[in-house]
């Protein structure tokens, strides 16, 4: 059913095991050769894949529509470049080289545990040891070519020109939905280097990626009712690991594609407000409000970060662009009472406990105060269109009052 509706643009980049090995190798180089903190890479090969695009070494899905020999030549060249880089530039040891394949296998087994349990995938499908050569710093290139060529050819009927498809649908009056899998603060230019991805992660990129003219779009800002990060980020609002809410949230917070444990923290209105101020969005969605319901000894107090403060007492109402400064800051919190009621069945805003409604209002008000600072607020404010109270599509509250009315509850 999915394949009948799927179109992969012919210019889509092909990322493979070479990129993933390079990702791990550069992380090893950063730590062992440069004596720096790890970047916290997912190990998915994203940055090396984009480096190939910038360097004009890319392999695209269009290559699956050509001959096998041409594809094999390009992938062989990529593999040889990767091996030389890993061995001679990154100076990876033989022991570490071998560990990469085990590490990638373990990561995929963890990320695909549910699919394997359901029989959708087999364990051998995610076994990266099959790509390791017999000698150190060699690859089973024939096997790599076979696996990736067969995978690409299986999608050959789904490869097409997405930009024409989008333009056709737009001319027919249909709505096009584009989704960014990462946040504004992971944008390669606007985020916190080196803890960023290799692409642009907010609205302007939709035109570049889709290949369509710049035009008016309606952007939704999407956030959780608390904060999470994964990797080695400086996390100003990170919760103490022993806090009852942190313990609870860590049971549900794992990377979608990697299965990695996420760090959890209090809602950071400074980051959200600056994402609105500099990134821009017309409406807001907040999910996982239900995860904040308290029980047990904890009294349910919730914190919202409304400013940062340095050691001299100076307050910051925006995220500093200087990472040295940002790393030195502490959060300034405003506390709000929590609630113990189960809100997963609420479908109307009025169904929520008073404390939950006030907390929601405070999240919206605090980010608006950051975004618009001392300027005159615009007439049309971003409204909270959807409020998630559970993982199911039906567990969404859609009647939240308009922003001007909502923030009066804070």
Task: Give the location of each predicted region.
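Non-transmembrane, aqueous-exposed alpha-helical and coiled segments at domain scale
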Residues: 1-410
């Amino acid at each position: 059913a999915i394949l009948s509706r799927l179109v992969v643009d012919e210019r889509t980049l092909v990322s493979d095991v070479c990129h993933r090995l390079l990702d791990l190798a550069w992380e090893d180089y950063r730590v062992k050769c440069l004596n720096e903190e790890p970047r916290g890479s997912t190990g998915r090969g994203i940055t090396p894949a984009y480096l190939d695009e910038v360097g004009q070494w890319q392999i695209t899905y269009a290559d699956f529509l050509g001959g096998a020999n041409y594809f094999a030549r390009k992938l062989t060249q990529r593999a040889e470049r990767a091996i030389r880089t890993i061995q001679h530039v990154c100076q990876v040891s033989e022991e570490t080289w071998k560990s990469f394949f085990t590490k990638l296998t373990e990561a995929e087994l963890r990320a695909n545990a549910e699919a394997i349990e359901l029989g959708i995938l087999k364990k051998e499908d995610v076994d990266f040891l099959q790509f390791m050569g017999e000698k150190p710093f060699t690859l089973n290139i024939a096997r790599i070519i076979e696996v990736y060529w067969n995978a690409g050819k299986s999608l050959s009927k789904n490869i097409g020109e997405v930009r024409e498809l989008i333009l056709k649908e737009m001319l027919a009056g249909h709505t096009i939905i584009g989704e960014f899998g990462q946040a504004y603060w992971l944008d390669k230019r606007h985020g916190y280097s080196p803890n960023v991805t290799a692409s642009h992660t907010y609205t302007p990129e939709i035109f570049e990626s889709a290949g369509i003219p710049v035009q008016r779009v309606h952007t939704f800002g999407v956030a959780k009712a608390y904060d999470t990060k994964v990797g080695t980020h400086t996390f100003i609002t990170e919760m103490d690991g022993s806090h009852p809410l942190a313990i609870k949230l860590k049971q549900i917070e794992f990377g979608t594609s990697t299965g990695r444990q996420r760090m959890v923290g209090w809602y950071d209105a400074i980051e959200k407000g600056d994402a609105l101020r500099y990134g821009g969005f017309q409406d807001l969605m907040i999910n996982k409000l239900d995860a904040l319901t308290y029980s047990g000894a904890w009294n349910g107090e919730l914190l919202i970060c409304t400013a940062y403060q340095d050691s001299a007492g100076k307050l910051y109402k925006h995220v500093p662009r200087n990472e040295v400064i940002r790393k030195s800051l502490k959060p300034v919190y405003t506390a709000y009472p929590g609630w113990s009621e189960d809100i997963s069945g609420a479908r109307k805003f009025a169904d929520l406990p008073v404390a939950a409604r006030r907390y929601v209002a405070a999240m919206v008000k605090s980010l608006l105060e950051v975004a618009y600072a001392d300027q005159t607020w615009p007439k049309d404010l971003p409204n909270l269109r959807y409020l998630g109270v559970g993982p199911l599509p039906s567990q969404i509250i859609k009647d939240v009052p308009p922003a001007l009315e909502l923030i009066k509850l804070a």
